[in-house]
Amino acid sequence: MIKKILISQPEPTSEKSPYFDIAKEYGVELVFRPFIKVEGLSSKEFRQQKISLLDFTAVVFTSRHAIDNYFKLAKELRINIPEDMKYFCVTETIALYIQKYVQYRKRKVFFGNTGKIDDLIPMMVKHKNEKYLVPLSSVHNDIVAKLLDSKKLNHKECVMYRTVSNDFTEEEAKAFDCDMLVFFSPTGIKAFTKNFPSFTQGDVRIA
């Protein structure tokens, strides 16, 4: 019988999350513990890509991590981002997150409605003279690059952050007693096996 489930994601901030409905309906305890975390590249590591942030007139953001690390690197490199820099975001939520770093109204911010890069392309084509920088994770595919190439847009992809194992403390490892594990990516599974090299599934359910 499943009584305790380990969810490999951060705990939801909203009380309306379906996770809490599941816990209440089935009488199970949910433990939220991310197995992976995002780590930004240092300015030294970023310089090795030989990319200058000021060579671009627009930035494409696909996540909040991209925004955080873009502005973190700009600060570390002592670069002042121009007031007329344009930002293209895959969702409105990501676009609004920019307010953490700059005055939203003073910027030219564009966002899609579907959460997919395809939705942004028409807007980017309207600004075809821009030079686009696309911050990415160390683990990424070339879908964005191919889409921008297909529209003959001037762009450059760069790595600004990476996904690493969020290691368990010795106390956490000893206290591990969950009946079910819920993973969301191969990276999460890899991180778990790193922390529990002698883990045997037994009666533990995995989803």
Please name every model-derived segment.
Residues 1-207:
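Conserved beta-alpha
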